[in-house]
Amino acid sequence: MTRAMHQVLLTCATMLACLPAAMPSASAAADGKRVAMFMGPTQDKYLGALSKSYETAATGSGMKVTTFSSPFDPALQAQQIDDAIAQKYDMFVVQIISQRAIIPVLTRVKNAGIPVVLVVAPMVGNENSAQDLYLTHVGYDDTKFGELIGEAMLKALKDTGRAKAKVAVLAGSMAEGKAPLREKAFRDAIAKHQGFEVVVTEDVKWNPAAGERAAGQLLARFAGQGGLDGFYGMNDVVANGAIQAAEGAGVKVGTTAGNLIVVGGNCQAPGVKNIGTGKQAATLLMLPVEEGKLAAARTKDYFDGNKPQKITFLPTETITKANIAQHAQACSY
């Protein structure tokens, strides 16, 4: 070996010795883990965006994600989960389709030793130790949602000079945990004010076409009783269905005296547009991309050997024409 070659090797060795040891990837523990995700209909813009966000974040940490979709069919979801148990996935991410039907299913999951992350809908109550059937829940506080949008409805009604009002609810799926929590909190908020009442709730399963049909039928039904004063569509596409039905029936929608008041939720593109044009009074901040990212982070936490906190609620706020501009981009998914 020449003196020059010896010097080169010595220099290289010195440089390598000075470099820090290769750090294991932050996702090393999660690398290669197989995750099965069970969602409602991913054609729904919120659920589709959440699923995509979760998969992108989890895949970035080395996980392999398979998504199963169900059209709010608890029997199909149970079958999908049972099939996945047999395939020995490392983690399940579940949107509860039916509170009652999911308990025996998740009991089988627990007995198989597979941890569960809940998204979208919470586990309600503790029947058969239901709160022990999942590792962590990531989502939004639906009771708070109902309260906030109820207060927004009341403000909009009172701002038009009304001293009393009849309001209808176009609900998401009442079999899951989410819609019933919102509906009850909304009713409670309205009931605090004498003369204001929720007169009917229709379960439209988050479907805008079903929401439009139900709204049209309710407008006709209450026409002989002085009419309805407001609609609460639990997401903005359902609220948009109510607006379409009202306009089709010749009922003026807006936020001024004599108008039908419509509020929504989940801050979606139709809501951004309708608030901007004055046809919708309010919505609530709810971002599926952020929910998906956080659920993936909680999954990674578990694989990294950490114990995620039991429940994590993302922040929300009421959105009206006064602040729609600052949220329009994030809500237009």
PLM regions with names:
Residues D31-K33, L170-M174, K178, A189, ...:
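Hinge/cleft segment of the Venus flytrap/periplasmic-binding protein
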Residues A36-F38, K88-I96, P115-V119, V169, ...:
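Periplasmic-binding protein-like
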Residues Y46-M63, F145-I149, G177-F196, A214, ...:
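Short, solvent-exposed amphipathic alpha-helices that sit
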Residues G32-S61, T66-D83, Q87-Y89, V93-Q99, ...:
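Extracytoplasmic "Venus flytrap"
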Residues V94-N111, F186, V199-K273:
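Hydrophobic alpha-helical
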Residues Q77, T136-A165, G211-A215, C267-G271, ...:
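Hydrophobic alpha-helical segments within soluble ligand-binding/sensing domains
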